[in-house]
């Protein structure tokens, strides 16, 4: 490489470090020849070494070596570790379909019928003290929530279901069934709270990334996706519900208390916070499974053949003929995903590991039938997805035949 000639040492130093192009045409070059300086390879190497000394603490070689000595991490540094670049993704003209309004700002889930049927009620047995504390807290909150909403996990006997007609009014009067309005009351309260953890975690990790002057490893985006997904659940059910003053007051009070409590929990122990959310989502899947069972058994006649709201058809890319039952099944699949992701994140090193789901989601079958990944499974999954992404990127750019 030919020597780089510039007007002054200061300009040369800043230009080399920035890696930017040389500015100026032939006239500028000729006028500078008599007063130029030539930098040898040794000088340029010294300039670059000086630059590392002035780097942020997290980028200095000694700090990076110390981090490596602590053991392996989930994920790795390098290209594509926090998700695909927009230029690496295959473009799709969603506006060609008149029934859609375009892509949503963040990831929005799309399921097949088979994938929706894979969702199961599963749970992770608590192991550590933190796990047990999170699990017991969720169980206590669940009991309080059931009492507030009048919910009873009652399974109607087959003999009662065989009656024509089914004594729905009698079952509701005995507190064994929820009416459509009580289901909406319960769901709206649940979803108004469920959108808090992702936003809290994303906010705190965003601030941590800026505070430490280092990248986050893909955690922020997944947590914000979770928060938006839960908010879309709330907006969907708001299209068929008209909350009164009492419901709005409860939402305001519950959200204010829960946000601050979860904020403090995440500051103290992100691991316990994610375990708490994983356990909370287990209960959400259980609740929606009960709701689906009641709808399929004809125990909520007000929702029979009710069409899916337009916002739900657009968000989940559902067929135009979809019903409210299809929407609730999609919501349950989302909750199973949050259960899977948060339990998996709780198993990671909260300060050093990369988010294994920054590159790609696990398969819907796994998300629906497993409580989550162990740390070893997360490391394997992250490596596999990074290799797939790199191979696809190289193939699309013509580097591989």
UniProtKB/Swiss-Prot annotation:
Q: Which gene encodes it?
A: AOX1
Keywords (alphabetical) are: Electron transport, Iron, Membrane, Metal-binding, Mitochondrion, Mitochondrion inner membrane, Oxidoreductase, Respiratory chain, Transit peptide, Transmembrane, Transmembrane helix, Transport
Which parts of the sequence bind Fe cation?
A: 191, 230, 233, 282, 335, 338
Q: How does it sit in the membrane?
A: Multi-pass membrane protein
List, alphabetically, the GO terms of the cellular component aspect. mitochondrial inner membrane
- Chain positions recorded as Fe cation 2 binding sites: 230, 281, 335, 338
List GO molecular-function terms, semicolon-separated: alternative oxidase activity; metal ion binding
**EC number(s) from the headed UniProt entry:** 1.-.-.-
Designated name of the protein: Alternative oxidase, mitochondrial
Q: Where does the source fall among the domains of life?
A: Eukaryota
Family, according to the entry, reads as follows: Belongs to the alternative oxidase family.
> How cofactor binds (record note)?
Binds 2 iron ions per subunit.
Q: Binding residues for Fe cation 1, per the UniProt record?
A: 191, 230, 233, 335
């Amino acid at each position: 490489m030919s020597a780089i000639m510039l007007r002054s040492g200061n300009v040369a130093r800043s230009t080399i470090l920035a890696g930017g192009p040389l500015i100026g045409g032939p006239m500028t070059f000729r006028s500078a020849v008599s007063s130029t300086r030539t930098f040898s390879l040794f000088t340029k190497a010294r300039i670059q070494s000086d630059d590392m000394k002035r780097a942020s603490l997290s980028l200095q070689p000694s700090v990076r070596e110390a981090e490596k000595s602590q053991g392996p991490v989930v994920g790795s540094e390098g290209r594509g570790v926090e998700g695909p670049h927009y230029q690496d993704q295959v473009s799709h003209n969603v506006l060609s379909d008149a029934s859609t309004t375009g892509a949503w700002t963040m990831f929005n889930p799309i399921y097949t019928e088979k994938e929706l049927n894979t969702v199961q009620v599963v749970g992770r047995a608590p192991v550590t003290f933190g796990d047990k504390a999170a699990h017991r807290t969720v169980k206590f909150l669940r009991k309080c929530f059931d009492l507030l909403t009048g919910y009873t996990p009652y399974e109607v006997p087959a003999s009662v279901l065989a009656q024509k007609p089914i004594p729905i009014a009698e079952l509701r009067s005995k507190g064994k069934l929820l009416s459509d309005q009580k289901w909406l009351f319960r769901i709206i309260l649940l979803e108004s709270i469920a959108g808090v953890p992702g936003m809290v975690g994303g906010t705190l990790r965003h601030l941590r990334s800026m505070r430490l002057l280092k990248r986050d490893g893909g955690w922020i985006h997944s947590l914000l996706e979770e928060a938006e997904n839960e908010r879309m659940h709330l907006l969907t059910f708001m299209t068929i519900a008209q909350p009164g003053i009492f419901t709005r007051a409860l939402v305001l009070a519950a959200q204010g208390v829960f946000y601050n409590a979860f904020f403090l929990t995440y500051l103290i122990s992100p691991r316990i916070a994610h375990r708490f959310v994983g356990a909370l989502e287990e209960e959400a899947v259980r609740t929606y499974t009960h709701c689906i069972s009641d709808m399929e058994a004809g125990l909520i006649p007000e929702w029979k053949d009710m069409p899916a709201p337009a916002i739900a058809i657009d968000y989940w890319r559902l067929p135009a003929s979809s019903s409210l039952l299809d929407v609730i099944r999609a919501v349950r699949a989302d909750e199973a995903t949050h259960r899977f992701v948060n339990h998996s994140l709780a198993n990671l090193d909260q300060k050093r590991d990369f988010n294994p789901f920054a590159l790609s989601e696990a398969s819907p079958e796994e998300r629906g039938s497993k409580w989550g990944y162990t740390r070893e499974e997360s490391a394997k999954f992250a490596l596999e997805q990074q290799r797939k992404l790199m191979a696809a990127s190289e193939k699309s750019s013509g580097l591989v035949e």
